[in-house]
């Protein structure tokens, strides 16, 4: 016998690792299986009219249609994901024999489209996938991303029903369901995430990447009908699926536009491969899921494109020799099948009829949205080398225009080539692209136009590669060699320009702090049903994670009652963070649960609240005693000298009015020191943001010293927002580091808890060079590098060091040389204790 083996203790899986695997392994595999099975079902029903390349995209379209149908009915919504899985299983069972055959025929025919799809998936996944955390992109850039996540969750749980109860989450949902907002992509995301029991935000980026991959497969199928070289088709499909303007917009929340682009491309690819005709009425059924899914994803917005492609296909099918009556019958079958699949989308879109009427007869004007200036039409050519689409193009404007001219020239050659070769549907696709865009520009404002540019860019790039491919396929002779070389150079140049532009976006895109939201999600689950809850900060994602508590935040606050003079804001503006001391007591007492971000300067909630949960980022406080216990709440700033004789007389009078047996509660303000970056040694190229903060550019450091009046354990935090790592050194020793922790103004980042002695300590805050990691660049948005005041706060008891004394001690407490967060008068019999 060998030596005995000692069993090693098993290590539990890190929750973030589990979420990452769920989002980036289980979820894509689920989509692969569901879309594959659904595609096989469509192939079976259509009599084999779906090619191998389009199997997954057609299955994706059917999945979108099924999930939209399922979420259109409240009672069926929770089972929409299961319904899509059942549909896929039916396809897998019916077509199981074809799977065995396909398994023995893996060749270059499969390899090239697979590479194109993989590249598209990887490019959209890279900013998150390479971090190893289940995050998402575009954090803090636009609140719409959170709203799309909320919509996806609601559709998967309750369909398009009107939400019950008041909360910021429900107000968002009411605004979306009330106006018929299209939800094909969101319904699919929510339903599929529900199948694996994973919250929508963790799966959001993977769904985006999958939608892009489906677009790449559709593009490959379209290109191979006009381009002879598989390599050119592969490159063209991979590149055209990620035009700069679409990539940038998708990484900042454009789930609707990315999905719609892929579905419109699928419709075009199916029409290019096979027009409805007299040979088989069933064959036209392959188109029905694609059209229905496109309508589900973008509602009436798909009309400018499909309104040109489908009539063109109809006319072309009737011009072909053969039985016209059977061709008409084939179109009739398609119309009926499409209508059946699209009924939920049509019904929900009725609420948008007013917008449709405006779009036909006038201009749908939504202003600039989150743009700082209108984006020109030329961006729809596919090359728009920018690190953030919201800002005007400056550094690479000339280069972008040169490459766009090249793209347009190649696209024009592609249209001429298609006409010459009588590839009528390819030509119709190329001609419909600028016509549809012209309509959008004529009937929409800057924000609406942007959405059209994102979708159009995929089509223009596709036709550019048709043009390049047509030149490379010319007969070999001396006269054509130069054209062939020029065509390949042009294709490579366009590819390089698109990839370079997207690399800039990757470099400057923001990432959500995943671990932070995992903590908030856990609080949301732990206190589900305890509400309404209040989250006194501007954070659109808090609405989602606190939805089960009917949470409110400052994005959609519930009629804030701000204490007079507490917040100095110009009329019409809002606060990004509020201290509870800045709010009226009656307002705070409306909420049984308070969820607040941990901060060294935050005030403790009123005395009838107890701390019931705490993480490194958040605290949950529950109202455990009646609001009537707190008779008076007097907010203070922590200064020992702020309480005047008049103030103390008023406090004693309030105690007398409260009656015999009343008491006084107060919270001593803990010792703390503050370092202001603008007063510290800092690089000259780090410019001031106001009087206290710096906007950091590039690498550099700030240095100074802090004087601590007492020794002990200090919580070190900073008001700011950072992307690339920022490291804190105390007396030459590394104390802590933060990265990818962007925040809105007035919110804090936590560096470390350190045991420090009384006296002077040298402080250095260092910011390194940008690396290859996503979001490490310095874009025009300031949130990637805001260095605010450093706070050194002496550790306090978790429950806020609440002190309660008899009312007779009110004078002593008030006149003591000590700073307080607040003082409260408690009613007789109040049970709050120190």
Residue ranges and their predicted role:
Residues 312-321, 333-340, 380-424, 470:
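Hydrophobic, aromatic-rich transmembrane alpha-helices
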Residues 2-108, 590, 829:
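Membrane-embedded, hydrophobic transmembrane alpha-helices
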Residues 494-497, 507-517, 523-570, 587, ...:
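Short periplasmic/luminal acceptor-recognition loop of GT-C membrane glycosyltransferases, typified by
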Residues 54-67, 87, 92, 116-126, ...:
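Membrane-embedded helix bundles of polyisoprenyl
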Residues 118-263, 393:
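Active-site lumenal/periplasmic loops and adjacent helix-entry segments of GT-C-fold
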Residues 146, 209, 257, 261-263, ...:
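Hydrophobic/aromatic-rich transmembrane helices and adjacent perimembrane loops
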Residues 122-123, 297-302, 345-346, 467-470, ...:
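Transmembrane alpha-helical segments
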Residues 285-291, 331-341, 462, 468-502, ...:
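Signature aromatic-anchored transmembrane alpha helix within multi-pass, membrane-resident enzymes
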């Amino acid at each position: 016998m060998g030596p005995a083996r000692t069993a090693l203790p098993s290590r539990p899986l890190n929750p973030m690792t589990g979420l990452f695997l769920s989002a980036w392994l289980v979820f894509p595999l689920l989509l692969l299986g569901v879309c594959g099975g659904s595609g096989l079902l469509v192939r079976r029903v259509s009599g084999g009219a779906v090619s191998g390349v389009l199997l997954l995209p057609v299955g994706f379209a059917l999945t979108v249609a099924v999930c939209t149908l399922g979420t259109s009915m409240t009672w069926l919504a929770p089972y929409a994901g299961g319904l899509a899985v059942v549909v896929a299983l039916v396809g897998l069972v019916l077509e199981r024999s074809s799977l065995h055959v396909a398994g023995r025929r893996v060749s270059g025919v499969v390899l090239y489209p697979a590479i194109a799809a993989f590249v598209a998936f990887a490019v959209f996944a890279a900013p998150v996938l390479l971090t190893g955390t289940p995050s998402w992109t575009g954090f803090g850039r636009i609140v719409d991303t959170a709203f799309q996540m909320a919509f996806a969750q609601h559709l998967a749980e309750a369909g398009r029903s009107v939400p019950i109860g008041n909360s910021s989450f429900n107000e968002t949902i009411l605004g979306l369901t009330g106006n018929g907002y299209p939800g094909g992509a969101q319904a699919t995301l929510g339903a599929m995430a529900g199948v694996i029991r994973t919250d929508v935000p963790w799966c959001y980026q993977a769904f985006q990447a999958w939608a892009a991959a489906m677009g790449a497969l559709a593009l490959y199928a379209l290109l191979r009908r006009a381009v002879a070289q598989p390599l050119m088709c592969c490159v063209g499909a991979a590149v055209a699926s990620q035009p700069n303007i679409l990539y940038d917009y998708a990484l900042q929340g454009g789930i609707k536009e990315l999905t719609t682009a892929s579905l419109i491309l699928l419709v075009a690819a199916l029409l290019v491969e096979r027009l409805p005709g007299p040979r088989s009425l069933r064959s036209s059924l392959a188109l029905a899921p694609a059209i229905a899914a496109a309508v589900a994803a973008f509602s009436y917005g798909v009309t400018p494109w499909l309104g040109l492609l489908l009539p063109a296909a109809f006319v072309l099918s009737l011009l072909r020799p053969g039985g016209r009556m059977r061709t008409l019958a084939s179109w009739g079958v398609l119309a009926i099948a499409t209508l059946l699949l699209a009924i939920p989308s049509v019904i929900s879109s009725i609420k948008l009829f007013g917008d449709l009427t405006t779009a036909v007869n006038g201009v749908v004007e939504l202003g600039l949205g989150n743009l700082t200036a209108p984006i020109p039409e030329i961006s729809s050519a596919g090359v728009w080398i920018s690190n953030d689409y919201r800002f005007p193009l400056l550094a690479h404007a000339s280069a972008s225009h040169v490459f766009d001219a090249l793209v347009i020239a190649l696209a024009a050659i592609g249209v001429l080539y298609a006409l010459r070769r009588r590839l009528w549907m390819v030509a119709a696709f190329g001609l419909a692209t600028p016509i549809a865009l012209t309509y959008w520009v004529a009937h929409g404002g800057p924000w609406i136009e942007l959405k059209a540019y994102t979708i159009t860019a995929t089509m223009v790039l596709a036709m550019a590669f048709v043009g390049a491919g047509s030149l490379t396929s010319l007969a070999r002779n001396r006269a054509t060699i130069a054209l062939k070389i020029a065509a390949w150079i042009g294709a490579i140049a366009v590819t390089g320009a698109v990839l370079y532009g997207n690399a800039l976006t990757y470099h400057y895109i923001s990432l959500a702090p995943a671990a932070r939201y995992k903590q908030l999600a856990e609080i949301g689950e732990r206190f589900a049903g305890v509400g309404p809850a209040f989250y006194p900060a501007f954070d659109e994602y808090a609405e989602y994670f606190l939805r089960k508590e009917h949470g409110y935040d400052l994005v959609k606050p519930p009629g804030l009652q701000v204490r007079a003079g507490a917040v100095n804001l110009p009329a019409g503006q809002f606060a990004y963070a509020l201290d509870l001391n800045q709010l009226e007591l009656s307002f705070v007492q409306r909420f049984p649960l308070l969820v607040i971000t941990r901060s060294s300067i935050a005030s403790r909630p009123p005395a009838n609240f107890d701390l019931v949960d705490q993480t490194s980022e958040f605290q949950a406080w529950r109202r455990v005693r009646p609001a009537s216990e707190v008779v008076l709440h007097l907010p203070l700033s922590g200064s020992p000298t702020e309480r005047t004789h008049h103030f103390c007389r008023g406090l004693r009078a309030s105690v007398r009015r409260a009656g015999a047996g009343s008491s006084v509660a107060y919270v001593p303000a803990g010792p703390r020191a503050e370092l202001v970056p603008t007063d510290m040694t800092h690089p000259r190229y780090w410019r001031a943001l106001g009087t206290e903060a710096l906007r950091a550019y590039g690498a550099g450091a700030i240095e100074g010293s802090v004087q601590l009046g007492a020794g002990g354990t200090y919580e070190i935090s900073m008001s700011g927002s950072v992307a690339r790592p920022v490291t804190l050194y105390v007396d030459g020793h590394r104390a802590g580091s933060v990265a990818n922790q962007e925040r809105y103004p007035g919110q804090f980042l936590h560096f470390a808890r350190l045991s420090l002695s009384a006296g002077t300590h040298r402080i250095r805050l260092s910011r390194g060079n940008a690396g290859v990691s996503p979001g490490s660049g310095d874009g025009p948005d300031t949130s990637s590098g805001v260095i605010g005041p450093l706070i050194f706060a002496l550790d306090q008891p978790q429950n806020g060091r609440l002190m309660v004394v008899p009312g007779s001690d009110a004078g002593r407490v008030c006149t003591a040389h000590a700073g307080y967060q607040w003082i409260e008068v408690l009613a007789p019999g109040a049970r709050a204790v120190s």
